[in-house]
């Protein structure tokens, strides 16, 4: 109030008013400030001042022919004065209004296509639902998030080439469009943008939004997918949050989510196979996510998640240098250590060999629901500052940090034996043994850790062994903070190596990732994941294994039946029969296999007993290592639907049902495909179904040209000879019969003759 009175007083003196209104602003510093550089120093003032003028806008001279001098109200729309310093005319804001209402209409067909990301955003917001506002302390941590919903995942360079090709197709310059996504997008956009009148520069900007993932390092408390980030300013403040459900999903979020699920499933499956690395690569290469090859997505998608990074490492791609332990991402922020093997005794006097990190180090730990700063020395936790969503999440972080510290009191807190195994039934390494043990029950660990008095520090609070907060006491070195710890912001990627057991190491040999670190969380993928590899058949349970195995046999029947007759051992060892073995009761697998193999051998030896349906039905049972026994079976058991179900050796059953009339096979009531030939030819020898009507003359004869496939035989004229490829690359010479009457005998002799011709 005093100040205002004083100012009023000053202003009442006429001299003051005169000085303030008449004095020229000739102070050099002020003039410099407002006139140097192109940058506007006070944009809002400048705007207000300009708009107060009559003609604040300049326009091309042509405007005078297109816009009348006055509008309906008689207001002047443009001035006859030229703009100083250019050949443009001065225009009133009213001219803009006139133009918007009465100006020429252009086609709007391209707008939704060009401004696609904006139109889609409006739709998402229109259909989104905003819930109540809650006032509470927001623990935000900075995370690298995707700020651009609805984009493809091209690299900046790839996108640049696509944009140049679409917007400036005739510009000179080397552009190589190699990836499938580049070619598809270019073709699609060129078609969409025919006769487009929107300025090329604008089109280029908008295309960039659509093609490239843009990330920012932002403080986030809730969801991190791009449809949440686009409304971040509406959903979380410093002390409030507003519930929001997006009104639509975007493909890039769905790709990220589905990629994580596919990668987890693949790593889990590969870990239990005989050669994890080879299996993992085979699965990554044969899997599609939403119709795109998984390996293409891995090359372009920057998602950082343990399983995804293991897949990337296997493909030789660079990944982040942070490492993972107990589901937390650790990044060393200072210090260093050397590693040394040391033997330690648990509370149960079990000896563990652990790799001890000697030296002082500081780490940030970032998990899904908690974050922390950890300072540690050799086998000693110096300080842990943790923050999390709830008690449970904070406890998880504390356990991981205590185990990671390798302190003696932690190892002594072990009660009972440590014998945790992974999915492949191999013992876990000692650090993961300890982790699993305390994740199951941390009571003794927390009780034995030790308590200390604490100082009152702003924003920090103590935590007792039973996880209750306290301002006086806390577990030694451990504090809970209201502030979160930011995620590691760098996007730097490093070269890594991966061993046969999927352990990923940096170039110094530090383990960054291993299958133990892959989350067991199950989720439902947003996009369809198609695993073509037989290793993934079991992901949907026993029924899926059953159906897939028989579908595979039917799809590959031409090759399968040839192998069946000529190289059965190779056929039995096919990896496609591996998943099926888990359905056959362990105790009897060997006997079933021996029985079926003997039965098949009899079929091969005794002409005329070849029965397609029976071979298909029993083949998967022959894949197990056979036990020789005199046992005969009339039915074989498989474990599906929670109990043993029977497959009849002769005849149909609910599990395996072949309909002779429709030639369709149903497995547990599900359609498994159609057989292309009639399986009920009692006499049909292996190739006979195919070679009826041909006489087998003997070994290949080069004079009759290159070998034809069985399907090409139909083109031969009667009496014509040709070489034909049968089986695994065996070639025999045949002649098309002149008379049809003798066709029947071919069936019986074909098998014998093929064998003789080959041998």
UniProtKB/Swiss-Prot annotation:
- Indicate yes or no for the key word Membrane: no
Q: Specify the domain of life of the species encoding this protein.
A: Viruses
> Mind naming one GO cellular-component term on file for this protein?
host cell nucleus
Q: List the residues marked with site Mammalian adaptation.
A: 627
Q: How does it assemble?
A: Influenza RNA polymerase is composed of three subunits: PB1, PB2 and PA. Interacts (via N-terminus) with PB1 (via C-terminus). Interacts with nucleoprotein NP (via N-terminus). Interacts (via N-terminus) with host MAVS (via N-terminus); this interaction inhibits host innate immune response.
The record's Pfam families line, in alphabetical order, gives: Flu_PB2_1st, Flu_PB2_2nd, Flu_PB2_3rd, Flu_PB2_4th, Flu_PB2_5th, Flu_PB2_6th, Flu_PB2_7th
Transmembrane region(s): none
Q: Choose any GO biological process term that the UniProt entry carries and state it.
A: 7-methylguanosine mRNA capping
Q: Does the keyword GTP-binding apply?
A: no
**MF (Gene Ontology):** RNA binding; RNA-directed RNA polymerase activity
- Which keywords appear in this protein's UniProt record, sorted alphabetically? Cap snatching, Eukaryotic host gene expression shutoff by virus, Eukaryotic host transcription shutoff by virus, Host gene expression shutoff by virus, Host mitochondrion, Host nucleus, Host-virus interaction, Inhibition of host innate immune response by virus, Inhibition of host MAVS by virus, Inhibition of host RLR pathway by virus, Inhibition of host RNA polymerase II by virus, mRNA capping, mRNA processing, Viral immunoevasion, Viral transcription, Virion
Kindly give the InterPro entries that the UniProt entry links to this protein.
Flu_PB2_2nd, Flu_PB2_6th, Flu_PB2_C, Flu_PB2_CAP-bd, Flu_PB2_middle, Flu_PB2_N, INV_PB2, PB2_helical
User: What does the record give as the function of this protein?
Assistant: Plays an essential role in transcription initiation and cap-stealing mechanism, in which cellular capped pre-mRNAs are used to generate primers for viral transcription. Recognizes and binds the 7-methylguanosine-containing cap of the target pre-RNA which is subsequently cleaved after 10-13 nucleotides by the viral protein PA. Plays a role in the initiation of the viral genome replication and modulates the activity of the ribonucleoprotein (RNP) complex.
Q: Where is this motif: Nuclear localization signal?
A: 736-739
Name listed for the protein in its UniProt record? Polymerase basic protein 2
Q: What is its main location?
A: virion
Its family remark reads: Belongs to the influenza viruses PB2 family.
Compartments (UniProt record): Virion; Host nucleus; Host mitochondrion
């Amino acid at each position: 109030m005093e100040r205002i009175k004083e100012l009023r007083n000053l202003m009442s003196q006429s001299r003051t008013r005169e000085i303030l209104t008449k004095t020229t602003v000739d102070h050099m510093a002020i003039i410099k400030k407002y006139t140097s550089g192109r940058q506007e120093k006070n944009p809002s003032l400048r705007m207000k001042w300009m708009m107060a003028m009559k003609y604040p806008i300049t326009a091309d001279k042509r405007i005078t022919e297109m816009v009348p001098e006055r509008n309906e109200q008689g207001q002047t729309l443009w001035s006859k004065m030229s703009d100083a310093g250019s050949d443009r005319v001065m225009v009133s804001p009213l001219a803009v209004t006139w133009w918007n209402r009465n100006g020429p209409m252009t086609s709007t067909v391209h707008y939704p296509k060009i401004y696609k990301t904006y139109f889609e955003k409006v739709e998402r917001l229109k259909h989104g639902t905003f819930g109540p506002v809650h006032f509470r302390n927001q623990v935000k941590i900075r995370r690298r998030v995707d700020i651009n919903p609805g984009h493809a995942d091209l690299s900046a360079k790839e996108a640049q080439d696509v944009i140049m090709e679409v917007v400036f197709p005739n510009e000179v310059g080397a552009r190589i469009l190699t990836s499938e996504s580049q070619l598809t997008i270019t073709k699609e956009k060129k078609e969409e943008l025919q006769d487009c009148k929107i300025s090329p520069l604008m089109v280029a900007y908008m295309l960039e939004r659509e093609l490239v993932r843009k990330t920012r390092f932002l403080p986030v408390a809730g969801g991190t997918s791009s449809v949440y980030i686009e409304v971040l300013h509406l959903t979380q403040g410093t002390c409030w949050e507003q519930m929001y459900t997006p009104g639509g999903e975007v493909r890039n979020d769905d790709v990220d989510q589905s990629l994580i699920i596919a990668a987890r499933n693949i790593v889990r499956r590969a870990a239990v196979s005989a050669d994890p690395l080879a299996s993992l690569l085979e699965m990554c290469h044969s899997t599609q996510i939403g119709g795109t090859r998984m390996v293409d997505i891995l090359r372009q998608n920057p998602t950082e998640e343990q399983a995804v990074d293991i897949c990337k490492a296997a493909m030789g791609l660079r990944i982040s240098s942070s490492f993972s332990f107990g589901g937390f991402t650790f990044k060393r922020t200072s210090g260093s250590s050397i590693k040394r093997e040391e033997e330690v005794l648990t509370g149960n006097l079990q000896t563990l060999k652990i790799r001890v990190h000697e030296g002082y180090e500081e780490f940030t730990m970032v998990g899904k629901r908690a974050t922390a700063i950890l300072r540690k020395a050799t086998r000693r936790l110096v300080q842990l500052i943790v923050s999390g969503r709830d008690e449970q999440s904070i406890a998880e972080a504390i356990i991981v940090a205590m185990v990671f510290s390798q302190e003696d009191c932690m190892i002594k807190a072990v009660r009972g034996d440590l014998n945790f195994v992974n999915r492949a039934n191999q013992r876990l390494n000692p650090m993961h043994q300890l982790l699993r043990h305390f994740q199951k029950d941390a009571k003794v660990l927390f009780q034995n850790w030790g308590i200390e008095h604490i100082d009152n520090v702003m924003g920090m609070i103590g935590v007792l062994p039973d996880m209750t907060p306290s301002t006086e006491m806390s577990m030694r070195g451990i504090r809970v903070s209201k502030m979160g710890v930011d995620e590691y912001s760098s996007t730097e990627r490093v070269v890594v190596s991966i061993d046969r057991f999927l352990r990923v190491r940096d170039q110094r040999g530090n383990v960054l990732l291993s299958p133990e670190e892959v989350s067991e969380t199950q989720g439902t993928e947003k996009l369809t994941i198609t695993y073509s590899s037989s290793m993934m058949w079991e992901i949907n349970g026993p029924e899926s294994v059953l159906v897939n195995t028989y579908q595979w046999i039917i799809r590959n029947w031409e090759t399968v039946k040839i192998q069946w007759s000529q190289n059965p051992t190779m056929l039995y060892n096919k990896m496609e029969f591996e998943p099926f073995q888990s359905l056959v009761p362990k105790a009897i697998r060997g006997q079933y296999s021996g029985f079926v193999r003997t039965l098949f051998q009899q079929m091969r030896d005794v002409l005329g007993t070849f029965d397609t349906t029976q071979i298909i039905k029993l083949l998967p049972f022959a894949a197990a290592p056979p036990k020789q026994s005199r046992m005969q079976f009339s039915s074989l058991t498989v474990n599906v639907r929670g109990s043993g179900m029977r497959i009849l050796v002769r005849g149909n059953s609910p599990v395996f049902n072949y309909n002779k009339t429709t030639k369709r096979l149903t497995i547990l009531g599900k359609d498994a495909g159609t057989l292309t030939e009639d399986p009920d030819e009692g006499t049909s020898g292996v190739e006979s179904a195919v070679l009826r009507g041909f006489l087998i003359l003997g070994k290949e004869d080069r004079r009759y040209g290159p070998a034809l496939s069985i399907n090409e035989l139909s083109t031969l004229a009667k009496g014509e000879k040709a070489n034909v490829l049968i089986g695994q690359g065996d070639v025999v010479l045949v002649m098309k019969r002149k008379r049809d009457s003798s066709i029947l005998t071919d069936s019986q002799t074909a098998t014998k003759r093929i064998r003789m011709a080959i041998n």
